Amino acid sequence: MNQEEMLDRQKHIRNFSIIAHIDHGKSTLADRILELTDTIAKRDMQAQVLDDMALERERGITIKLNAVELHYKAKNGETYIFHLIDTPGHVDFSYEVSRSLAACEGALLVVDATQGVEAQTLANVYLAIDDDLEIIPVINKVDLPSAQPDVVKEEIEEMIGLDASDAILASGKTGLGVPEILERIVTDVPAPSGDLNAPLQALIFDSVYDDYRGVVLDVRVKEGQVKVGDTIQLMSNGKQFQVTEVGVMSPKAVKRDFLMVGDVGYITAAIKTIQDTRVGDTVTLADRPAEKPLKGYRKITPMVYSGLFPVDNAKFNDLREALEKLQLNDAALEFEPETSQALGFGFRCGFLGLLHMDVVQERLERDYDLDLIMTAPSVDYEIIMTDGTEKTIDNPADMPEVSEIKEIREPYVKASIMVPNDYVGPVMELSQRKRGEFVTMDYLDKYRVNVIYNLPLSEIIYDFFDDLKSSTKGYASLDYEITGYRQSDLVKMDILLNGDPVDALSTIVHKDFAYERGKAIVARLKTTIPRQQFEIPIQAAIGNKVIARSTVKAYRKNVLAKCYGGDITRKRKLLEKQKAGKKRMKSVGSVEVPQEAFMSILKMNDEESQGK
């Protein structure tokens, strides 16, 4: 392809993303776009084509961003190259959205005609506005009887400030409005800027590990071009590799001779060491490097921490390898080795939220065939020591002695809860119960309210989302952002089994709720810890003070079965012998803590844990 043809190709490239709140139908709309551009043969078509992870299909949600190249012949007779990047809608995966948008010039804002603008719609739109993208509003699901497109148009204008007079009315199910969407992408989304002859600058927005090809880099080329045989250099560490293959996803991998300005594709270069690459790095050519790297991504900070341990300790290295490979594909995951007396060697992992944690555990167990135990989640706590020093901990087991602590601070979030008017009461009640502090309440229209609360993050990560959905019949939507740390009256609660503290079961709780939480944990453990030959006392303690206790009764063999009548002293002797044996067994016996015990604490029910 000569210079002129390349410049003409650049003019015909359109890069766009689809952003929406969870369940507003963006993956279905993406299916219709793939169908209409003949990217996928009718016989290969299936629901949510771009959600190619088994886990995504099962849960019906998008977890990973996905890039795909389409070819569309517009009404003006010219063929355009579209790069569509499908994004997740859940608050835990907003980092995936921000990375997708950095690779685009435009975005389709999809809003459900029956639900209207929701919390995550707003959060994602602001990301797109920050990146200065051209936004095309699409009102989806207009074929439903309960659709209110005019009301939704008003909401888009009032809440987001976008002109929605020419918003496209569409249905991902029937395909209505999809041809109009494609035409608007051609006319409204600008072609990528960038100099074809400048030194190569390509932004790594995702990566994945392939057993045969090594690390596969997903890139958006911002300047210059790259082809097979070129020697590339990673600008963060100066490492050099020879390109073995370049191509695009359509939606399966299609090899190409080169990638140029505006292209969204992949590069393989026999990169075998996972640590050499990171998302947000810039790829350039070794013999003609760019002067400075592209603006990468802000460092993402995990919000929730949990211990991850292999059931079989011999699998520790397998778990490390699996986490390293997964981290390539999930840039928000953080981990470091840790040791637990109860569970052996494992890793302390940082996640963006509870769904992210759940998804990581499931991907590790499925894709890497590991059996794992996950401890109850915790957040970062700032501890001011009596000598004036500061310490940050994310593991209750690391909590210093009470005598050394001056104050403990915990992270707070500003939670924005959008809810129909009828459910404001239950939402406020739930937020107050979770130690929330009311900030303000805005009436969005006649039907819906945006309630804003300051809440401790530790209260949100357990079951706040589940409780919110059940108390509002599924109508509420939630978005939150960290606002800082505040001093709180927190204590460390230890769980003792057979008199020994189990470090993996320790939790940090608010003093006011310690008794109820301790009582509930002890009751839950009693039902999940299997009975032994000796009885097991389960205790919840703060310092040396036991605040709750229960006992798992022992199995007993009937030692009197062979005694038919006879002297009572004979029976007493047998019973005393059994008692002595049980006592000896108890002093040396160790208690196995099953995975269900950890999970039962993870999903503590609100009525138990905070004594409604």
From Swiss-Prot:
SUPFAM superfamilies the record matches: EF-G C-terminal domain-like, P-loop containing nucleoside triphosphate hydrolases
Pfam families with a match to the protein in the record: EFG_C, GTP_EFTU, GTP_EFTU_D2, LepA_C
Record localization: Cell membrane
Keyword hit for Nucleotide-binding: yes
Cellular component, GO annotation: plasma membrane
Signal peptide: none
Annotated ranges, domain tr-type G: 11-193
Biological process (GO), any one: positive regulation of translation
Catalysed reaction, written as an equation: GTP + H2O = GDP + phosphate + H(+)
GO MF terms held by the record: GTP binding; GTPase activity; ribosome binding; translation elongation factor activity
Primary subcellular site in the record, as a coarse category: membrane
Protein keywords: Cell membrane, GTP-binding, Hydrolase, Membrane, Nucleotide-binding, Protein biosynthesis
Domain of life assignment: Bacteria
EC number: 3.6.5.n1
Membrane topology, record value: Peripheral membrane protein
PROSITE patterns linked: G_TR_2
Binding-site residues, GTP: 23-28, 140-143
UniProt-listed CDD domains: EF4_II (cd03699), EF4_III (cd16260), LepA (cd01890), lepA_C (cd03709)
EC main group: hydrolase
Family per similarity comment: Belongs to the TRAFAC class translation factor GTPase superfamily. Classic translation factor GTPase family. LepA subfamily.
Function noted in UniProt: Required for accurate and efficient protein synthesis under certain stress conditions. May act as a fidelity factor of the translation reaction, by catalyzing a one-codon backward translocation of tRNAs on improperly translocated ribosomes. Back-translocation proceeds from a post-translocation (POST) complex to a pre-translocation (PRE) complex, thus giving elongation factor G a second chance to translocate the tRNAs correctly. Binds to ribosomes in a GTP-dependent manner.
Protein name in the entry: Elongation factor 4
UniProt organism field: Lacticaseibacillus paracasei (strain ATCC 334 / BCRC 17002 / CCUG 31169 / CIP 107868 / KCTC 3260 / NRRL B-441) (Lactobacillus paracasei)
